[in-house]
C-alpha cells in the first residue's frame, strides 16, 4: 500500500513543481530523501537510565529501533569522554518516512502549544529543513503517564532540492504548515 502523502507527492506535487520550476525531466523534481530524528541527552552522563527511556520513546515515535550516538571526542568542561553514549537517533526512509511526515504535519505540529506555523528560516541553504520539538509528548504514540522526563528532539527533513527556494516549494505543496 502506497502511503497517502507519497501518493499526493506523485500525483499533485511533482506536476506542479515541474511547471513552477520548468524541469525537463521528472528526475529533476526535488524529493524527500530521508528524515533523521535525534534526541541529544546531556543527562546520560550521570543517569544511564535516561538513555533507555529516550530509546524507548524514539522507537515508539519512529517505528524502528534507534541507534545510540556516542561522543566523538572528550570535552572536560562537559565531563564527556570519547565514546560515551550521549544520544539516540533514527533515520527514516521509504514508507516509514512518508507516514512519519504525514503524522508530523497533520497530528503533531497542530498539537504544539501556541502553534502558528513553522518558521521558514529553518532551511540550511541546501534545501534541507530542521525542526526542534521541545517535548516528546505531542506524539500520539507516547503514553503521557509513562513519561519520566520531557525531552526535546530534532527532526531533519533531507531533500534533494539544490536550494532553499525549491525545498520550501516541495514542503509547502506537501502540506507543511509554514507561517508566512
From Swiss-Prot:
Keywords: Ribonucleoprotein, Ribosomal protein, RNA-binding, rRNA-binding, tRNA-binding. GO terms for cellular component: ribonucleoprotein complex; ribosome. InterPro entries: Ribosomal_uL5, Ribosomal_uL5_bac-type, Ribosomal_uL5_C, Ribosomal_uL5_CS, Ribosomal_uL5_dom_sf, Ribosomal_uL5_N. SUPFAM superfamilies: RL5-like. GO terms for molecular function: rRNA binding; structural constituent of ribosome; tRNA binding. Part of the 50S ribosomal subunit; part of the 5S rRNA/L5/L18/L25 subcomplex. Contacts the 5S rRNA and the P site tRNA. Forms a bridge to the 30S subunit in the 70S ribosome. This is Large ribosomal subunit protein uL5. It comes from Roseiflexus sp. (strain RS-1).
Amino acid at each position: 500500500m502506497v502511503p497517502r502523502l507519497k501518493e499526493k507527492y506523485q500525483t499533485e506535487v511533482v506536476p506542479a513543481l515541474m511547471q513552477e520550476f520548468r524541469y525537463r525531466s521528472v528526475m529533476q523534481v526535488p524529493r524527500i530523501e530521508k528524515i533523521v530524528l535525534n534526541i541529544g541527552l546531556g543527562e546520560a552522563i550521570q543517569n544511564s537510565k535516561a538513555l533507555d527511556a529516550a530509546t524507548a520513546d524514539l522507537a515508539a515515535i519512529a517505528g524502528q529501533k534507534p541507534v545510540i550516538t556516542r561522543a566523538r571526542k572528550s570535552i572536560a568542561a562537559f565531563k564527556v569522554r570519547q565514546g560515551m553514549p550521549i544520544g539516540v537517533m533514527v533515520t527514516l526512509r521509504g514508507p516509514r518516512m512518508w507516514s512519519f511526515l504525514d503524522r508530523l504535519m497533520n497530528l503533531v505540529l497542530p498539537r504544539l502549544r501556541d502553534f502558528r506555523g513553522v518558521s521558514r528560516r529553518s532551511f540550511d541553504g541546501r534545501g534541507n529543513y530542521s525542526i526542534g520539538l521541545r517535548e516528546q509528548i505531542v506524539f500520539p504514540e507516547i503514553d503521557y503517564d509513562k513519561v519520566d522526563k520531557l525531552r526535546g528532539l530534532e527532526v531533519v527533513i533531507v531533500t534533494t532540492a539544490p536550494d532553499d527556494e525549491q525545498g520550501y516549494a516541495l514542503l509547502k505543496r506537501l502540506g507543511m504548515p509554514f507561517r508566512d
